[in-house]
Amino acid sequence: MEPLVIKLGGVLLDNEEALERVFTALQEYRQTHERQLVVVHGGGYLVDELMEKLQLPIVKEQGLRVTPADQIGIITGALAGIANKTLLSWATKYQLASVGLYLGDGNVVTVSQLSEELGHVGKAMPGDAKLLKTLLDAGYMPIISSIGVTDKGELMNVNADQAATAIAQTLGADLVLLSDVSGILDGKGQKIPDINVEKAEQLIAHGIITDGMIVKVNAALDAARTLDRPVDIASWRHADQLTDLFNGVPVGTRILA
């Protein structure tokens, strides 16, 4: 079975109950299955809290955080520091052998600047799988922040969904986008079991899929096309379903290529 990339998002990093559910599921899964797991995370809520404390403006365009040069250090500290080490501490608590990384380690993901207007915001492309494969084969679960670096040595804030997609591409792995939403909802608030490009474009055009969810859906669609396999969007709230989810059973919205 191919490795599985699990992207953790939403309020999960700021919610002890959520972390407990996810790491309990990861521990149970690792005890009963041999599938290799990679965790990728952002930490938007942590960044927002830090920015507010420092009285710095929070600006987003189409779900992507505008990152001026004077803020990239703060965001790097929040994501590659606080968020990453928080998850590593939970992994230790649940006896999960883990290693904390950022996208530049071993050139796991190749990153370039997305645009001058967004500042230090990076575009993620597949990189070198050697380091990840070495860690996975040794029994470790890599926990990777969405901070990257360009070939000029400039730190970049990468959308975590897109970072997870690039890592799945690098490894030829399956991808699950795990957050506080159970999947994509239709206009009546009902979960959509599966969705393709055409259906997604219709929902975006009608304003049903908006803001950060557009980035999430586009990242999942891009991953599904690139990997030529389905990608799942699901919630951590349904802890009893997570083991099935990690085994490839759809429990949220399945994104079709």
Swiss-Prot record:
Pfam families: AA_kinase. It is an enzyme of class 2 (transferase). It is found in: Cytoplasm. InterPro entries: AceGlu_kinase-like_sf, AcgluKinase_fam, ArgB, Asp/Glu/Uridylate_kinase, NAGK-NC. Substrate binds at G43, G44, R65, N157. CDD domains: AAK_NAGK-NC. GO terms for cellular component: cytoplasm. This is Acetylglutamate kinase.
